[in-house]
Curated annotation (Swiss-Prot):
Monomer. It comes from Chlorobium phaeobacteroides (strain BS1). Residues 122-159 are annotated as: LID. This is Adenylate kinase. ATP binds at G10, A11, G12, K13, G14, T15, R123, T132, Y133, G203. Catalyzes the reversible transfer of the terminal phosphate group between ATP and AMP. Plays an important role in cellular energy homeostasis and in adenine nucleotide metabolism. It holds the Pfam family ADK_lid. Pathway: Purine metabolism; AMP biosynthesis via salvage pathway; AMP from ADP: step 1/1. Consists of three domains, a large central CORE domain and two small peripheral domains, NMPbind and LID, which undergo movements during catalysis. The LID domain closes over the site of phosphoryl transfer upon ATP binding. Assembling and dissambling the active center during each catalytic cycle provides an effective means to prevent ATP hydrolysis.
Length: 218
């Protein structure tokens, strides 16, 4: 079973990806992890990717797809995998389809932009320990300081509202079109078509896990 998880940054994909991976005993495949592994192992594709990255350029879809195919050939993928952050664009989705890489489920976790901004911009971190708080949902005992050490908490640059809005803009331009792409793919795919589902990513983590399990049990 091969699964693609879609959703904007901050929609909760990371938490649910870990849940799906452990529940179905399938690896979570990240293009970033694949790139790092290929570079560290010195594979031909890894060396090619390193050359491109060292030149400050983006790694091509051709290289990424080559890495995906290499990864899928490994024994831990024999029962399937969960794609994390791939595909990001229609071109990458087309490349998957053209290479006859079968996808079984696409799950879109839907959360409104303003809810995502509230979630992400409210995060505060204790840099030394990594302890994470949220000004609304998990506030420290004393505003602005770590519960254990009393050190000041910080807001990571990635969590600043302006940065979050920019990331959401990129998502809506580049990745959100995949939702309609896979919805159409499901309609036109015949008896072996993939299953496409949209779930609301609001509510408790456990309630969202339950929604995901229902997709696979129906």
């Amino acid at each position: 079973m091969r699964i693609i998880l879609l959703g904007a940054p901050g929609a909760g994909k990371g938490t649910q990806a870990q849940f799906i991976s452990s529940t179905f005993s399938i690896p979570q495949i990240s293009t970033g992890d694949m790139l790092r592994a290929a570079i560290n192992e010195g594979t031909p594709l890894g060396l090619e990717a390193k050359k491109v990255m060292d030149a400050g350029k983006l790694v091509s879809d051709e290289i990424i797809l080559g890495l995906v195919k290499e990864r899928l050939s490994k024994s831990d993928c024999k029962n399937g995998c969960l794609f994390d952050g791939f595909p990001r664009t229609i071109a990458q989705a087309d490349a998957l389809k053209n290479d006859c890489i079968q996808i079984d489920h696409v799950i879109d976790i839907e959360v409104d932009d303003e809810e995502i901004i509230k979630r992400m911009s409210g995060r505060r971190v204790h840099p030394a320990s990594g302890r994470t708080y949220h000004v609304l949902f998990n506030p420290p005992a004393k505003e602005g300081v770590d519960d254990i050490t009393g050190d000041p908490l910080v807001q990571r640059e990635d969590d600043c509202e302006e940065t979050v809005r920019k990331r959401l803009d990129i998502y809506h331009k580049e990745t959100a079109p995949l939702i309609e792409y896979y919805r159409e793919y499901k309609k036109n795919g015949g008896p072996n078509a993939l299953k496409f589902s949209t779930i609301k990513g609001t509510g408790s983590v456990e309630s969202i896990k339950e929604k995901i399990l229902n997709i696979f049990h129906n």
